[in-house]
Design a protein with these regions (language model features):
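Flexible coil/linker segments and helix-coil junctions enriched in charged and small residues
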Residues: 41-44, 54, 90-103, 223-239
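Positively charged, helix-rich recognition surfaces that bind polyanionic ligands
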Residues: 3-9, 166-431
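A generic secondary-structure signal for well-formed alpha-helical elements
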Residues: 34, 41, 83, 87-90, ...
Length: 431
């Protein structure tokens, strides 16, 4: 049994100037408290929330007696998190300065500082008393509110001074129970596609990350050349135009849709998801073998870890078990003979050097991940006896294990189930 948390961002209705000024004053006092606590925590090494609260609570209460007392608690939590993050970055040699800076502030609230007044409004405790804030709600909020999710006691608010609004970060939680898996789904993520092996059938989801990355790369380059020529390198207009590009949103949308498809299959079949055991920064390890600047840039932007993280988050939300297998040589070794697969002329289809079988490199990677998961994770999933691998060396043999079913991005990105993404009925599987 695990508890899963998700954050939903909602905005308030535009606030009157007098009411918004109350939150501007509250933010100023909150910022001063956090700055004071962060500098103290880094200087003295006291980064524990409990210890920091014990040492600084009375001082904060004497400095800001007009604030509700629990703001002293939440500022200590905020400062403790910031101090730990700064010291970790400083230890890795990535800190730009020797002391932390508080640039952006989100006001942390606990159950004594805010509450739901109704389904469309909340109340926030300030130095002027309790204030009612009306919310502009959207589809995602109602999706969580009308399901098994419950609103957590903690929340955050941020000020949008251009529109005189509050941005509220609501946390929803629910309890999920993991099931006893009856099989495996192996997933192999690459730069331009992701391969998924389900019940002996391989599906190749075309993500087109390479085209998206290069398209935005050349677009940014043209924008920079155009505005640098007339306005200079640090012009505000160019920055605003570049901020309007939606590369991150497009890639994030594809990641979550792909993760949703994989997890829905696993839930319906009660399977475990098998992923590659990647390092902390797999792209950095991969680019060490390449000198082409454009290829290195593409690998950095391909988000191998990001796709895995999306699958992990979705799996945690639905209680799907996830296991990891060593990805070393998964696309080079034949799963039948444990011998090398020879690829010629940069082809994605290779031949086993011992048995002569033809293998697609993404399909064989999924099979090897599946084999390693079944041999090494000790789960309740079926043993190797149920694994069906076509050993026929004849091209396009009876089951054609080397040839995956390719699904273009225009098909699967519209839907949320694998069955709906298959164009032909003959390719469909029963989910």
């Amino acid at each position: 049994v695990n508890e899963v948390a998700r954050t939903v961002i909602v905005r308030s209705t535009p606030l009157p100037r007098k009411l918004f000024r109350v939150f501007v004053e509250l933010e100023g006092m909150y910022r001063n408290m956090v700055e004071q606590l962060v500098l103290y925590a880094v200087r003295t090494g006291v980064i524990s929330f409990t210890r920091l609260k014990a040492l600084k609570y009375r001082e904060l209460r004497s400095q800001y007696p007009q604030l509700p007392s629990h703001y002293a608690y939440t500022t200590c939590q905020d400062a403790s998190t910031r101090a730990k993050s700064f010291l970790r970055v400083k230890k890795e040699g990535l800190a730009k300065r020797g002391y932390p800076e508080v640039n952006r502030v989100s006001i942390w609230l606990d159950d004594h500082l805010w509450r739901m007044k109704s389904l469309t409004s909340i109340e926030i405790a300030t130095h002027k008393g309790w204030v009612v804030i009306e919310l502009e709600l959207h589809k995602l909020f109602w999706k969580y509110m009308n399901s098994e999710w419950r609103v957590a006691s903690e929340a955050k608010i941020k000020l949008n001074k251009w529109e005189r609004r509050l941005v509220i970060y609501l946390v929803f939680k629910k309890i999920v129970e993991a099931y006893r898996p009856r099989g495996f789904i192996s997933v192999d993520v690459n730069e331009n596609h992701a391969a998924v092996l389900v019940d002996g059938k391989a599906y190749l989801f075309k993500t087109d990350f390479r085209d998206i990355i290069l398209g935005y790369y050349y677009r940014r380059k043209r924008i920079q050349e155009k505005y640098d020529k007339f306005y200079g390198a640090s012009c505000r207009v160019k920055k605003k135009v570049l901020e309007g590009l939606k590369e991150r949103e497009r890639k994030s949308n594809l990641k979550w849709k792909l993760a949703n498809i994989v997890v829905r299959i696993a839930v319906d079949k009660q399977y475990t998801i098998v992923l590659e055991r990647l390092g902390k920064n797999p792209a950095k390890e991969m680019v060490n073998h390449f000198r082409d600047d454009q290829l290195r840039y593409r690998i950095y932007q391909a988000s191998f870890k990001g796709v895995q993280r999306a699958v992990e988050e979705k799996a945690r939300e639905h209680g799907v078990p996830v296991v990891y297998a060593d990805p070393r040589n998964t696309s080079r070794m034949c799963p039948i003979h444990s011998s090398l697969i020879v690829y010629e002329n940069d082809s994605r289809v290779g031949r086993c050097s011992r048995g002569g079988e033809l293998w697609h490199r993404d399909v064989v990677a999924c099979y090897n991940l599946l084999l390693r998961a079944r041999l090494g994770n000790g789960s309740n999933a079926p043993s190797l006896g149920g694994l069906k691998v076509d050993g026929s060396p004849v091209p396009l043999g009876s089951t054609a294990t080397y040839e995956p079913t390719e699904i273009s991005r225009s098909l699967w990105a519209r839907w949320k189930s694998l069955d709906a993404t298959n164009k032909n009925k003959s390719m469909r599987i029963s989910i």
